[in-house]
Amino acid sequence: MNNLRKKVLMMTMAAVTLSAIAQQPVDYVNPIIGTNGMGHTFPGACTPFGWVQLSPDTDTIPHNINGAYQKNAYEYCAGYQYRDKTIVGFSHTHLSGTGHSDLGDILLMPAVGDVKLNPGRADYPEEGYRSRFDHATEKAVPGYYEVILDDYGIKAQLTATQRTGIHKYTFPKGKDGHLILDLVHGIYNYDGKVLWANLRVENDTLLTGYRITNGWARTNYTYFAISLSQPIKDYGYKDKEKVLYNGFWRRFKLEKNFPEITGRKIVAYFNFDTANNSELVVKVALSAVSTEGAIKNLHAEASGKSFEQLAEAARTDWNSELKHFEIEGTPDQKAMFYTSLYHTMI
């Protein structure tokens, strides 16, 4: 009889504990709400009022094609459409709920197999680095996002601090992977949006650079510092802009293992030994001032902390803001309220 009472007591305590956890305001938020049609929201990771909004971009429609204005470009104000079947990559800045498009800065995309330096088309993803995905493997909660990139078998997990986006990529066992860094990509893109870009390899685990863009904000400077959990094996890039004179290069080629590059249409790749270590953690810090500022932000907010610690901290930050408001209602009503409140803080 005593054993039965103990079991009942333990089950009751467990139920109370689970109920208390489920009743946290952060658990009612659904970042997927608003991502279809003209809702103009994104499902990715960010913190309350943070600068970084790390989220998947499923496509972009140029502002104009051959001089003709494209009115459907505004469907991608936030870079993501729920109806889409492919992901181009993960960029670090997004607008939420606006009627205008911009940002989509510093896009990363992990991959295996042949290196492809163009995004490809949604109807033919094999021609580029984009990947198919399924919403069944997608998870979006405040401060955290994950998805399986079906074409590569890569699990992508994202979280964020105020000024840093953190990626965790798990590659298929036994396969070497690479990381694409696209400094051309943008939301509401058009030829000439990127005024200038720079990429510098500081060492085999640290990259720095910047890009200057015209958009809703003119001459917008975005500096970055990228920390890598694995050393780079080798790397290269492609400048998609036709240059009349490339200088006197003598016997070496700057397209591979360069120390520093600049241009307006830079897309780079970095190879890693993921066959022996399948996890790659990438921390990308931003600054509006300098690459030195980006490095300082990286050290201040993300250095020495695991992906899991940072994801839990982002969740805690969101719950701390949301719990200032207590409401009564059904679970659906609470989901509507706290998701709307969440969107006011992005």
Where are these regions (language model features)?
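Accessory carbohydrate-recognition regions in carbohydrate-active enzymes
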Residues: 23-346
